[in-house]
Design a protein with these regions (language model features):
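Conserved beta-strand -> loop -> alpha-helix junction used to position metal-binding or nucleic-acid-contacting
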Residues: 12-27, 69-77, 137-151
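Short glycine-rich, Thr/Ser-proximal phosphate-binding strand/loop in the N-terminal lobe
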Residues: 56-91
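A short acidic Gly-Thr/Ser loop motif
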Residues: 36-53, 57-60, 117-120, 164-171, ...
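Phosphate/ATP-binding catalytic cores across multiple sugar-kinase/actin-like superfamilies
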Residues: 26-34, 91-109, 152
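Acidic, glycine/GT-rich loop-and beta-edge segments that sit at the periphery of enzyme/chaperone cores
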Residues: 144, 150-198
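Glycine-rich phosphate-binding loops at beta-strand->alpha-helix junctions
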Residues: 1, 100-130, 137, 141-142
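Phosphate/oxyanion-binding active-site loops and adjacent basic polyanion-contact surfaces
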Residues: 1, 19-22, 85-97, 141-146
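Nucleotide/phosphate-binding catalytic cleft detector across ATP-hydrolyzing
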Residues: 1-47, 57, 95, 133-134, ...
Length: 198
């Protein structure tokens, strides 16, 4: 609310201000691509000086559309940015990532993998990339979140898609009220609604 309050103070209308998390912009970026990119699960590897994060998008078809789940795993304990400073560290990091991918692909069908962040400026992950590109598309880019934020304003286009991730409510939240002798559900928050906009 601090960010939206600041922009309101600067004269922007409240309904024109949208605060999005990295995860939300990542999902928006994936959804704006061709469906073949997100035909199956989609993985994002993000590394900066402080952390190495893996986010997986999975989806499930439901009666009224599509539910997208984003699961996040912190891999900083396995590979750190400091490992990439030496040749032997880069080789070790590639072996660790390759092992992680091989294990993950036993349970997930992944159609696309994205790499972003300063940790992926150099191509230290050659063996891992070869494994990924065997049956999947792979992209490396440094402006994925900015592009995702730009297209996220088109989220109305995806009104039949429910996105469940960190920063969004996972369930409908409501109360039962009595109105004219009948019980009715009064919705307070919908599943997939951003906490920052609640």
């Amino acid at each position: 609310h601090l960010v939206s309050g600041l922009f309101q103070t600067l004269g922007f209308a409240k309904e024109k201000i949208h605060v999005k998390t990295h995860t939300e912009t990542y999902v928006s970026y994936v959804l704006c691509n061709k469906r073949e990119i997100w035909a199956n699960d989609v993985t994002l590897f993000r590394m900066d000086e402080n952390e190495f994060i893996c986010q997986n998008i999975t989806k499930r078809r439901v009666k009224n559309g599509l539910v997208i789940f984003v699961e996040e795993e912190n891999l900083t304990g396995r590979i750190s940015y400091n490992m990439l400073k030496t040749k032997s560290g880069r080789e070790q990091a590639d072996d660790i990532l390759l092992s992680y991918l091989q294990e993950d692909y036993k349970t997930h069908i992944v159609s696309c993998v994205f790499f972003t962040g300063i940790g992926f400026y150099d191509n230290w992950y050659r063996k891992s990339a070869a494994e990924i590109c065997r049956r999947r598309k792979a992209f490396k880019g440094m402006n994925l979140f900015a592009d995702g934020a730009a297209v996220s304003i088109q989220d109305e286009e995806y009104k039949d898609i429910l996105i469940l991730c960190e920063g969004k409510t996972l369930l409908n939240i409501g109360i039962l009220i009595e109105k004219e002798g009948n019980e009715e559900e009064f919705s307070m928050l919908r599943a997939g609604q951003s906490w920052t906009e609640s």
